[in-house]
Amino acid sequence: MKSARKAAATKTAKGEQTKTLILSTALEMLHERGYENTTMRAIAEKAGVSLGNAYHYFGSKDHLIQAFYHRTHEDHLRASLPALEKESSLKARLLAVIRLKIDTLEPYHEFAGVLFQTAADPHSPLNPFAHAAAPVRRDSIKLFEDLVASSKARIPDDLRAELPYLLWLYHMGIILFWIHDTSRKRARTYRLIDQTVDLLDKLISLASNPLMRPVRKRALKLVTELRDFEAEEVEAN
């Protein structure tokens, strides 16, 4: 019984190693050749595995990219947890999470530029708003839900319900800026993060002011329309 469990564990570990090897090889080749010029056969050959084995772990190049999305999210989540446990203010929590997102993505900066050429297509399954990206998108929004829920900030209930989604959109905008940032050590990106997080924190604080209620309601109505539009696009694709 023990030997059977040991054999199963060894097989699982070997499978994970093979899966990681295929993904790492694919990312390297996608960076070198671009998305269109990289084939599953070429990935398998360079990784030293059979084509059937490559397809066993990843059904297509799209599945490889979704695995990349998932891996970078998991890296970001692990990096963010200590900061979220330490900080209680919304500003400090948001600043840490957004900065750590860029920290964890930085090793893939050049590849991200190549990937963006395909992911920017609204009809591409690699688009962050696409149906195929829904699991990672939900997990990422969940991180922002935890960020908001455990903060000590006073946030109106209607804004609190939509804030995680809005912060997810904000962080996607930061990533887009980072992709195009050629400054040394992405200094412009980090400066943008510092300034915009401070601005967002002030705006969220102002949202509790009774005089801001009509403006807040109108803004949240636009968010609802945006969500409805996104849902329609996902269904259409």
Give short role names for the model-derived ranges:
Residues 2, 21, 29-63, 67:
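Helix-turn-helix
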Residues 154-165, 180-184:
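Short acidic, glycine/proline-enriched loop segments that cap or flank alpha-helices
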Residues 2-6, 142, 176, 180-237:
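C-terminal peripheral helix-coil segments that are non-catalytic and often amphipathic
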Residues 67, 81-114, 121, 131-135:
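Hydrophobic alpha-helical connector segments
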Residues 126-152, 161-173, 191, 197-202:
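Amphipathic alpha-helical packing segments from all-alpha helical-bundle domains
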Residues 70-77:
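Short, basic, alpha-helical segments at the C-terminal edge of helix-turn-helix-like DNA-binding modules
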Residues 15, 19-27:
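Short, leucine-enriched amphipathic alpha-helices that occur as contiguous helical runs
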Residues 113-116, 156-157:
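Short, hydrophobic secondary-structure boundary micro-motifs
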